[in-house]
UniProtKB/Swiss-Prot annotation:
Protein name: Pyridoxine/pyridoxamine 5'-phosphate oxidase
EC number(s) from the headed UniProt entry: 1.4.3.5
Function of the protein: Catalyzes the oxidation of either pyridoxine 5'-phosphate (PNP) or pyridoxamine 5'-phosphate (PMP) into pyridoxal 5'-phosphate (PLP).
Alphabetized InterPro entries for the sequence: Pyridox_Oxase, Pyridox_Oxase_CS, Pyridox_Oxase_N, Pyridoxamine_oxidase_dimer_C, Split_barrel_FMN-bd
Positions bound to substrate: 8-11, 66, 123, 127, 131, 190-192
Keyword Flavoprotein: yes
Organism of this sequence: Paraburkholderia phytofirmans (strain DSM 17436 / LMG 22146 / PsJN)
GO molecular function: FMN binding; pyridoxamine phosphate oxidase activity
Pfam families in the cross-refs: PNP_phzG_C, PNPOx_N
Catalytic activity: pyridoxamine 5'-phosphate + O2 + H2O = pyridoxal 5'-phosphate + H2O2 + NH4(+); pyridoxine 5'-phosphate + O2 = pyridoxal 5'-phosphate + H2O2
Keyword rRNA-binding in annotation: no
NCBIfam families cross-referenced by the UniProt entry: pdxH (TIGR00558), PRK05679.1 (NF004231)
Length: 213
């Protein structure tokens, strides 16, 4: 087995300075996200979502970002899943985007609110039919006896709703309302650039600070 201690990479693709970034972190995120798209990175919209349960035990998983604006970062899921239960108990979370090909990370922290039913309905209607049926078929994070049980449920839902399944009441969107957003750019010798946007509330101006790597 390869020695884990020997696996390392020196970062040298870019730099990050306060003078060069947008004062608005959402616009700065949009710039970096578009650069990730233009670089044809595989699934640049993937992010790690970290949540914490009522006992303080963390969990993390990869989800897809589905919207970003001045209100926050939006994703959709099953409200009865593990992450849904944890967000109900502790409505704070962290997101992490990692674009390794660009030697960049973006970390977002803040409180979680549900999107409106109208927003959830609109996004659900835009999904492929198979995904809409799957939202009904899967009791996400619950134990099942076999794969065939899931596939049987999928067929039953397909017969029940045809090509017009409604949005399940237990499925919808969340919006992370940021309190802090960090932009990280890899640099040589592990002396990375880290710029942190913070604000005291949603109506305050963003402040930018540099963090030691």
């Amino acid at each position: 087995m390869t020695s884990l201690a020997e696996l390392r990479k020196n970062y040298s693709l870019g730099s990050l300075d306060v003078a060069d970034i947008d004062r608005n972190p959402f616009r700065q995120f949009d710039t970096w996200f578009q650069q990730a798209v233009d670089a044809k990175l595989p699934e640049p919209n993937t992010m790690t979502l970290a949540t914490v349960d009522s006992r303080g035990r963390p969990s993390a998983r990869i989800v897809l970002i589905k919207g970003v604006d001045e209100r926050g970062f939006v994703f959709f899921t099953n409200y009865e899943s593990r992450k849904g239960r944890e967000l109900a108990a502790n409505p704070y979370a962290s997101l992490l985007f990692y674009w390794i090909e660009l030697e960049r990370q973006v970390r977002v922290e803040g409180r979680i609110v549900k999107t409106s039913a109208e927003e959830s309905d609109a996004y659900f209607a835009s999904r492929p039919l198979g995904s809409r049926i799957g939202a009904w078929a899967s009791n996400q994070s619950q134990l099942i006896e076999s794969r065939s049980q899931l596939e049987t449920r999928e067929r039953e839902i397909s017969l029940q709703y045809g090509d017009q399944p409604p949005r399940p009441p237990h499925w919808g969107g969340y919006r992370l309302v940021p309190e802090a957003i960090e932009f990280w750019q890899g640099r040589p010798s592990r002396l990375h650039d880290r710029l942190l946007y913070t604000r005291s509330d949603e109506h305050s101006d963003w402040q930018i600070s540099r963090l030691s790597p």
